[in-house]
Every structure is written in C-alpha cells, then in structure tokens.
Amino acid sequence: MQRVTITLDDDLLETLDSLSQRRGYNNRSEAIRDILRSALAQEATQQHGTQGFAVLSYVYEHEKRDLASRIVATQHHHHDLSVATLHVHINHDDCLEIAVLKGDMGDVQHFADDVIAQRGVRHGHLQCLPKED
C-alpha cells in the first residue's frame, strides 16, 4: 500500500470528515478508498461490453391502465438479464419491485430505462456493480 498526500479546500475536508463520521469510517483513508472504488465501479458499468450485476428498484401504481402487464412484458422481453424479482405491496395502490439483473451493462441500462420510462412508474433507481474477475 502506498501513502499519498492530497490537498483539499477547507469545505471539502469538512464534508469528507462529516461523511466519514456518519458512515463510521475509522479514518479518512478508508473513506477515500471507498469513494474511489465507487467512482471506478460507476465508470466501468457505463461501458457497453462490461459484464456485471445490477439492482433495479421502482414503485408503480398496480391499477394504472395496463401498467403491470407492460412491465411484465418488458421483463419477459429481457428475460436473459433477470436473475430474480421481489414484489412488495406498499399500500392499496402502490407496489415496489426490486429486480436483480446480470449481464452486459449496456443492456441492463436499456432494460432499466424501458421500465422507468413507463407512465405510472416512480422512484426508479438502478445500482450497478461491475463483475470482478
């Protein structure tokens, strides 16, 4: 492991220290390493051809006209990406779905965009992780 020195302005250092404390890091180095790993993983998952895993979460109104069937059709169209799906009834009108996906990150992003763009889908979020060799 190498020791390096970086220069941060006072506000950024204060933000780093606050983040480190909130997340329970023992020191700034651990926080910086995790921030860097996260940035590298995000960059890697934005490239076509990169294999990886993802979690797509979204809320939708299950009685919105044909929405549930359109979402299912989209899932079946991309069946090769789907590992598992969890369906949760939030209340009388809304459902939360969490889909675990695996495959080419470009295809995963396309699938997520198709689902999130459906009218009636809210709070769509895709979290990607590159496959580690």
Curated annotation (Swiss-Prot):
GO terms, biological process: response to nickel cation
Alphabetized GO MF terms: DNA-binding transcription factor activity; nickel cation binding; sequence-specific DNA binding
> Which InterPro entries does the entry link to?
Acetolactate_synth/TF_NikR_C, ACT-like_dom_sf, Arc_rbn_hlx_hlx, CopG, CopG/NikR_regulator, Ni_resp_reg_NikR, Nickel_NikR_proteobac, Ribbon_hlx_hlx
**Keywords on record:** DNA-binding, Metal-binding, Nickel, Repressor, Transcription, Transcription regulation
Superkingdom per UniProt: Bacteria
What quaternary structure, including any partners, is listed in this protein's UniProt entry? Answer: Homotetramer.
Q: What is this protein called?
A: Nickel-responsive regulator
Encoding gene (name):
nikR
